Amino acid sequence: MITESRQMLDKRNRPLRDLRISVTDRCNFRCTYCMPAELFGPDYPFLKKEELLSFEELERLATLFVTRFGVEKIRLTGGEPLMRKDMPELIKKLARIPGIRDIAMTTNGSLLPVYAKRLKEAGLKRVTISLDSLEDERFKKINGRGVSVSKVLEGIEAAKQAGLGVKINMVVQKGVNEKDILPMARYFKEKGHILRFIEFMDVGNTNQWEKKDVMTKAEIIDLINKHMPVEPIAPNYIGEVASRFRYLDGSGEIGVISSVSDAFCGSCNRARLSARGELFTCLFASSGFDLRAPVRQELSDDELSEMIGTVWKNRIDQYSVDRTLSKASGKKKVEMSYIGG
């Protein structure tokens, strides 16, 4: 049933349309900009199994977001989501929710050779795969676990063969991998996959972010345009975070996610559910709203919906805009590996 709450807007008149679900805070990589190995070591207190929302609890909450609030897309994140056991079973549960249009996953790709076919059969439609360099030694250093580029490329091919839609994300950092922009663009242009460049962001508190390390959207596009001319094109939908550009020779497109240099807070329609069941209304949030406790206290769907609706209606987040206006300095934020990228 379509309810009035489908049109619910936050304090800045932004609707709720996308839900990102972090299914685990664990990862088999230790990327320097997300889970640096020196801080996320063997003794790091990751969540215990009983602290995680169960698949049944995730299904229940996701159903409310879709049927009561009009969410159309769900993206599964982590950590590395494929570190969570039996992920195809969760996807099957989510795929049967009435009204859901799209289920996607963000992954480092290393486990896709094992899981891609089963994920597709379960109902997953798309994957976004993180790859920050094609140069093996540089990539091994970035991922902090010595994983070779070939392992991720195998995952990309497995996803393609399984019939999943594929996009590639590259986080660009000056002094780290800006030399890889053109090789990455050429490689995935030839392969026919959309590559999206992500400006290095100050997510969490552990990645030693400094603005001088950010290569901006303008700089990235200027570099590519000199070698492979591109032109801007319209977004696919309202709230799409990547600015889109197509190659003038007709051989595909790229995107740039520019949270730092060109904030898109004004059209952000995403809510984020952590693995522990906290609802966050911004990637750069300091705290979330606990939904796990009321779910386990067996509150009714109406009561849970009232809580979710109250959180969204009171949402005022615009961190990236505030950063631009120098209003966000010193704010303590939740780590990306916990909230989901």
Swiss-Prot record:
Residues binding S-adenosyl-L-methionine: 33, 79, 130, 201
Enzyme Commission number(s) of this protein: 4.1.99.22
Short name of one Pfam family: Mob_synth_C
Cofactor(s) for this UniProt protein: [4Fe-4S] cluster
Superkingdom to which the source organism belongs: Bacteria
Annotated GTP binding sites: 20, 75, 106, 167, 270-272
Residue span, Radical SAM core domain: 11-231
Keyword Calcium (UniProt): no
InterPro entries with a match to the protein in the record: Aldolase_TIM, Elp3/MiaA/NifB-like_rSAM, MoaA, MoaA_NifB_PqqE_Fe-S-bd_CS, MoaA_twitch, MoCo_biosynth_MoaA/MoaC, rSAM
Binding site for [4Fe-4S] cluster 1: 27, 31, 34
Keyword Transcription regulation among UniProt keywords: no
UniProt pathway: Cofactor biosynthesis; molybdopterin biosynthesis
Class of enzymatic activity (EC top level): lyase
Catalytic reaction(s) noted: GTP + AH2 + S-adenosyl-L-methionine = (8S)-3',8-cyclo-7,8-dihydroguanosine 5'-triphosphate + 5'-deoxyadenosine + L-methionine + A + H(+)
Entry keywords, A to Z: 4Fe-4S, GTP-binding, Iron, Iron-sulfur, Lyase, Metal-binding, Molybdenum cofactor biosynthesis, Nucleotide-binding, S-adenosyl-L-methionine
One example of a Gene Ontology biological process annotation: Mo-molybdopterin cofactor biosynthetic process
CDD domains for the chain: Radical_SAM, Twitch_MoaA
Similarity comment text for this entry: Belongs to the radical SAM superfamily. MoaA family.
Quaternary context: Monomer and homodimer.
Function recorded in the entry: Catalyzes the cyclization of GTP to (8S)-3',8-cyclo-7,8-dihydroguanosine 5'-triphosphate. Required for both nitrate assimilation and respiration.
Protein name: GTP 3',8-cyclase
